[in-house]
C-alpha cells in the first residue's frame, strides 16, 4: 500500500526510481488507501493546477484505491490509544492510513518512516529514492 508521500513522489517524478521499482511488480500488488487518495486530490485542488489535478487523476486511475472498512476501525482505536499512551502520536491522516494497511496485513510503502515506524505491528518500508 502506497502512502501519500509515495504517491506524491510518483506525481513529481513519474519516471523515477520509485516508479521503476513499482513497475517491476504485478499491477494488483500495488494499491493505496482512499485516505491517501483524498489527501492527494485535496492537495491538487488546493493548488488550483489543472495539470497537477490531471496527473493525480491519471495515477489514481492506474491504481487500486481500497475503501476504508472494518476492521480498520479496530486497528485505528488500538494504534491511537497505544501511541497516545506512549506520548508518540502521529498525524490523523497517517493514523488512518496505518490502520488501513495494518488491518489488511499489507506493507506500507512510505517516505515517512519516522512517523510510521512508531506504529506497532505495521510493516513499513521506504524504498530508495535514487538508484545506487
Enumerate the language-model features and the residues they cover.
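Active-site neighborhoods of divalent-metal-dependent phosphate/nucleic-acid chemistry enzymes
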Residues: 54, 64-109
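Alpha-helix capping/helix-boundary segments
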Residues: 6-7, 36, 72, 97, ...
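Generic structural signal for small/hydrophobic residues in well-ordered secondary structure
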Residues: 3-4, 40, 76, 101, ...
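Acidic, PIN/NYN-like endoribonuclease modules and their adjacent C-terminal/linker elements
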Residues: 98, 102-132
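Short, well-structured N-terminal submotif of metal-dependent ribonuclease cores
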Residues: 1-32, 42-58, 78, 130-132
